[in-house]
Design a protein with these regions (language model features):
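Beta-lactam-recognizing serine transpeptidase/beta-lactamase-like catalytic domain environment
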Residues: 168-218, 223-455, 462
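Periplasmic/cell-envelope proteins involved in peptidoglycan metabolism and beta-lactam response
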Residues: 1-189, 207-208, 213-215, 293-301, ...
């Protein structure tokens, strides 16, 4: 009997030790995973039921948490929602978060490591956790203008300070209302989200940095021009063949210049003139001469193929590898499989504007706790050297000529030296194009660098539309 009792006690002790070991493992190793699990109701209410910090532009809250009369305690509210949706994203109890709401979730929710002492102070004072506020670099007036310029069309506008990297505007169209996804009625949230995801115009995409990337069209010729100068084989006096049609090696296809432009008036051209008139064949000839490796290396130095967070994650721009000569010729004019974001195009112009130095783009000016102590504050950060001062200055001069004497003239501002480049990217066989403009102003002391893209535009009106948008953005910043 004693042996049976001892055996029973030993078995019970083993079971107890096993249970304690399992519980300890869960407590120390799986606790974080269980806390963050989507079916943890307590964690859900804690996260969505605390007073989340505000997102602020020019001293005004564009996202805030207000008291609600339900189990969540607080409702996330977005003012001017469509104008800022691509930046703020949404904070949803059903679908999680996107945009700044996601990128700075720990700071906004008050759970970041840097807010530990803040949480302790709130605990002893009996106050509930309150998140930090996030102030953006965006200028509200410029963001409003960018959003208005896109109304009724698909596309994106990015504006930044080329000397600091601060993003001054980032608009995407069509947009959506994040208030509908932040609602506490699960059925209505699911219905609205489903409608948005099924919309063929993809309003949930922030076209400036993510979603479907674009062919850059002739804006890529800025990179070709840099590669040409860096190679030492070309300078401002170099003359390149400018045939109306360039036979693509190994194919029965030709690469044409635009029939109705000035390109047809010359059989040879300098890089400056070819850039101003946006002739295709001289730049294809340059790329074929320099080779894929040189064009690819130059694109990489401007950001193609590089990871980037602003702190929103940016889709990589891509310059393809292992191309045939025919494909390289098409890629040199921003076609074939070259893909980019409007932010990348703006960064390219910004690097030229800033003497070849590319500053890291950033959306966040500061993060401050509820007692106004600063957790982090923006300071300009060099991202990379894209090219030399000498090369940048030469390309800048060519871009100024594109506005003064070329097809980018619609972006000109009276009394201001403006640098710019248009682009037209063919999309399939629809006959429609994506129309680009990128540039900066004033050219001799740049305050703003921009990229504008309109989707599905007729070639006859594209350049006029995109350059006019550029002109208005420049005038807004320069108070013209």
């Amino acid at each position: 009997v004693d042996r049976a009792i001892r055996r029973m006690w030993m078995s019970a002790a083993c079971v107890f030790i096993l249970l304690m070991g399992t519980l300890s493992y869960i407590q120390f190793f799986d606790a974080q995973m269980l806390m963050e699990h989507k079916w943890n109701t307590r964690a859900l209410y804690d996260n969505y039921g605390s007073q989340r910090g505000s997102i602020v532009v020019n001293g005004t809250e564009i996202a805030s948490s207000v008291k609600s009369n339900d189990e969540y305690n607080y409702q996330r509210v977005y003012s001017e929602p469509e104008k800022y949706a691509g930046i703020t994203g949404y904070f949803s109890s059903v679908y999680g978060s996107t945009g700044i709401e996601s990128a700075l979730d720990k700071e906004l929710s008050g759970t970041s490591d840097s807010q530990f002492y803040d949480r302790v102070a709130q605990l002893f004072s009996g106050n509930s956790t309150r998140g930090a506020s996030v102030e953006l670099t965006v200028d509200d007036k410029l963001q409003t203008l960018a959003y208005q310029l896109l109304q009724g069309r698909k596309g994106s506008i990015v504006a930044m300070n080329p000397k600091t990297g601060e993003i001054l505007a980032m608009a995407s169209s069509p947009s959506y209302d994040p208030n509908k996804l932040a609602a506490h009625n699960e059925q209505s949230v699911i219905a609205d989200y489903t409608k948005l995801t099924q919309d063929q115009q993809s309003p949930l995409f922030n076209r400036a940095i993510a979603g479907n990337t674009y062919s850059p069209g002739s804006t890529f010729k800025i990179i070709d021009a840099v590669a040409a100068l860096e190679s030492g084989k070309y300078d401002e006096k170099s003359v390149i063949d400018n045939p109306a049609q360039l036979p693509l090696p190994g194919t029965n296809v030709t690469l044409p210049n635009f029939v109705n432009g000035q390109c047809a008036t010359r059989t040879q051209a300098t890089i400056e003139w070819a850039l101003a008139q946006s002739c295709n064949t001289p730049f294809a000839n340059i790329a074929l001469d320099l080779g894929q490796e040189k064009i690819s290396q130059t694109a990489s130095k401007f950001g193609y193929g590089q990871d980037l967070s602003i702190p929103l994650k940016v889709t990589k721009s891509d310059f393809p590898s292992d191309m045939t000569k025919s494909q390289l010729a098409q890629a040199s004019v921003g076609q074939y499989d070259v893909k980019t974001t409007p932010l990348q195009v703006a960064m390219t112009s910004a690097a030229i504007a800033n003497g070849g130095v590319q500053m890291k783009p950033n959306l966040v000016r500061s993060v401050k706790t509820s007692n106004l102590s600063t957790l982090s504050e923006f300071s300009p950060e060099k991202l990379r050297t894209s090219t030399s001062q000498k090369v940048a200055d030469q390309v800048k001069q060519w871009m100024v000529n594109s506005v003064d004497n070329g097809i980018a003239s619609g972006a000109g501002v009276s009394g201001v030296k403006v640098a710019g480049k248009t682009g037209t990217a063919e999309i399939g066989t629809t006959g429609l194009n994506n129309s680009w403009f990128t540039g900066f102003a004033p050219a001799d002391d740049p305050k703003i660098a921009i990229a504008v893209v309109y989707e599905d535009i007729d070639v006859s009106t594209g350049a006029k539309l995109s350059t006019n948008a550029g002109k208005q953005l420049f005038e807004a910043v320069l108070n013209k």
